[in-house]
Amino acid sequence: MAKQDYYEILGVSKTAEEREIKKAYKRLAMKYHPDRNQGDKEAETKFKEIKEAYEVLTDSQKRAAYDQYGHAAFEQGGMGGGGFGGGADFSDIFGDVFGDIFGGGRGRQRAARGADLRYNMELTLEEAVRGVTKEIRIPTLEECDVCHGSGAKPGTQPQTCPTCHGSGQVQMRQGFFAVQQTCPHCQGRGTLIKDPCNKCHGHGRVERSKTLSVKIPAGVDTGDRIRLAGEGEAGEHGAPAGDLYVQVQVKQHPIFEREGNNLYCEVPINFAMAALGGEIEVPTLDGRVKLKVPGETQTGKLFRMRGKGVKSVRGGAQGDLLCRVVVETPVGLNEKQKQLLQELQESFGGPTGEHNSPRSKSFFDGVKKFFDDLTR
């Protein structure tokens, strides 16, 4: 079957500069890398084609030969005696790019770092504002306490891989050229476990639940994450452990709402207090405090109590408490109260008293003008 054009494989033009080729290779290598497509033979074949195309097109001599002779340039005898020499070693062809993407393309493959874990923690507003220490229990993978992460039975050691001789890489011939690939026998580790540990069966890790004490700093809010370094899953065969991320979710409070570092609450007052003014008690997270309400206070007026909000988890000034006044209409009036209110209303000059209810007057004046305009 005819081989696909190297330029088409990478999706670049025949005049593409090296940086364009490198960029295309990085993108495709990430997409088709075997670690991301385990068990996918089609992706594995595609990845090999991408590597082969990159090897040729980023080498000026190889690229010139390919542009002139095509794939025949790299077949045995394809260029007569004028090739690059059968003994050429291009083992470092992927060093700079492939290593940047996957953490080192040459040499033995590092054991995989442990996976990061996430734990969702629900807090009350009081806990979030003041800070709290909580114990949590999480399922995880921990280092095997029998083999101490090696995967080998106690008294034995992992043996050097006979295929790659411990390098983790094997050399594959392609025409005149040699490329290095991950050893299929040891998967790049350079060692094999002949006598696996009876407890972890050679994995070096076991499933276990552990209890942790998590200190939540004061001022956290929904969406904040707390990182516990090294408290994730244990790494493979002694590799570093991952991290644990505690995701904060603050429960809804029956009185307060939080916006940033400020707290908001609604304070109901009766219409007499709103009209005459006075002193009321309002709740804060530190207890009750007195608030002076001036006369003629309207519904919706905000009163700011400085420093009664939330202390920022990132430092800086403490937030405020903003109390929104809601003037309540009285219900369940007795006859005497109704009579007094009737007298009060008459003293205002009726339901739309102009002097004592300026907003009411403004509204009804607007309504009158609206209908007058309609009848003209």
Curated annotation (Swiss-Prot):
<comment type="subunit">
    <text>Homodimer.</text>
</comment>
<keyword id="KW-0862">Zinc</keyword>
<feature type="binding site">
    <location>
        <position position="183"/>
    </location>
    <ligand>
        <name>Zn(2+) 2</name>
    </ligand>
</feature>
<dbReference type="InterPro" id="IPR008971">
    <property type="entry name" value="HSP40/DnaJ_pept-bd"/>
</dbReference>
<feature type="repeat" description="CXXCXGXG motif">
    <location>
        <begin position="183"/>
        <end position="190"/>
    </location>
</feature>
<keyword id="KW-0346">Stress response</keyword>
<feature type="binding site">
    <location>
        <position position="200"/>
    </location>
    <ligand>
        <name>Zn(2+) 1</name>
    </ligand>
</feature>
<dbReference type="GO" id="GO:0008270">
    <property type="term" value="F:zinc ion binding"/>
</dbReference>
<feature type="repeat" description="CXXCXGXG motif">
    <location>
        <begin position="197"/>
        <end position="204"/>
    </location>
</feature>
<protein>
    <recommendedName>
        <fullName>Chaperone protein DnaJ</fullName>
    </recommendedName>
</protein>
<feature type="zinc finger region" description="CR-type">
    <location>
        <begin position="131"/>
        <end position="209"/>
    </location>
</feature>
<keyword id="KW-0235">DNA replication</keyword>
<feature type="repeat" description="CXXCXGXG motif">
    <location>
        <begin position="144"/>
        <end position="151"/>
    </location>
</feature>
<dbReference type="GO" id="GO:0005737">
    <property type="term" value="C:cytoplasm"/>
</dbReference>
<feature type="binding site">
    <location>
        <position position="164"/>
    </location>
    <ligand>
        <name>Zn(2+) 2</name>
    </ligand>
</feature>
<keyword id="KW-0677">Repeat</keyword>
<dbReference type="GO" id="GO:0006260">
    <property type="term" value="P:DNA replication"/>
</dbReference>
<dbReference type="Pfam" id="PF00684">
    <property type="entry name" value="DnaJ_CXXCXGXG"/>
</dbReference>
<feature type="repeat" description="CXXCXGXG motif">
    <location>
        <begin position="161"/>
        <end position="168"/>
    </location>
</feature>
<feature type="binding site">
    <location>
        <position position="147"/>
    </location>
    <ligand>
        <name>Zn(2+) 1</name>
    </ligand>
</feature>
<dbReference type="InterPro" id="IPR002939">
    <property type="entry name" value="DnaJ_C"/>
</dbReference>
<feature type="binding site">
    <location>
        <position position="197"/>
    </location>
    <ligand>
        <name>Zn(2+) 1</name>
    </ligand>
</feature>
<dbReference type="InterPro" id="IPR036869">
    <property type="entry name" value="J_dom_sf"/>
</dbReference>
<feature type="domain" description="J">
    <location>
        <begin position="5"/>
        <end position="70"/>
    </location>
</feature>
<dbReference type="GO" id="GO:0005524">
    <property type="term" value="F:ATP binding"/>
</dbReference>
<keyword id="KW-0143">Chaperone</keyword>
<feature type="binding site">
    <location>
        <position position="161"/>
    </location>
    <ligand>
        <name>Zn(2+) 2</name>
    </ligand>
</feature>
<dbReference type="InterPro" id="IPR036410">
    <property type="entry name" value="HSP_DnaJ_Cys-rich_dom_sf"/>
</dbReference>
<comment type="function">
    <text>Participates actively in the response to hyperosmotic and heat shock by preventing the aggregation of stress-denatured proteins and by disaggregating proteins, also in an autonomous, DnaK-independent fashion. Unfolded proteins bind initially to DnaJ; upon interaction with the DnaJ-bound protein, DnaK hydrolyzes its bound ATP, resulting in the formation of a stable complex. GrpE releases ADP from DnaK; ATP binding to DnaK triggers the release of the substrate protein, thus completing the reaction cycle.</text>
</comment>
<dbReference type="GO" id="GO:0042026">
    <property type="term" value="P:protein refolding"/>
</dbReference>
<dbReference type="GO" id="GO:0009408">
    <property type="term" value="P:response to heat"/>
</dbReference>
<keyword id="KW-0863">Zinc-finger</keyword>
<feature type="binding site">
    <location>
        <position position="144"/>
    </location>
    <ligand>
        <name>Zn(2+) 1</name>
    </ligand>
</feature>
<dbReference type="InterPro" id="IPR001305">
    <property type="entry name" value="HSP_DnaJ_Cys-rich_dom"/>
</dbReference>
<comment type="similarity">
    <text>Belongs to the DnaJ family.</text>
</comment>
<dbReference type="GO" id="GO:0051085">
    <property type="term" value="P:chaperone cofactor-dependent protein refolding"/>
</dbReference>
<dbReference type="GO" id="GO:0031072">
    <property type="term" value="F:heat shock protein binding"/>
</dbReference>
<dbReference type="Pfam" id="PF01556">
    <property type="entry name" value="DnaJ_C"/>
</dbReference>
<keyword id="KW-0963">Cytoplasm</keyword>
<feature type="binding site">
    <location>
        <position position="186"/>
    </location>
    <ligand>
        <name>Zn(2+) 2</name>
    </ligand>
</feature>
<keyword id="KW-0479">Metal-binding</keyword>
<dbReference type="InterPro" id="IPR018253">
    <property type="entry name" value="DnaJ_domain_CS"/>
</dbReference>
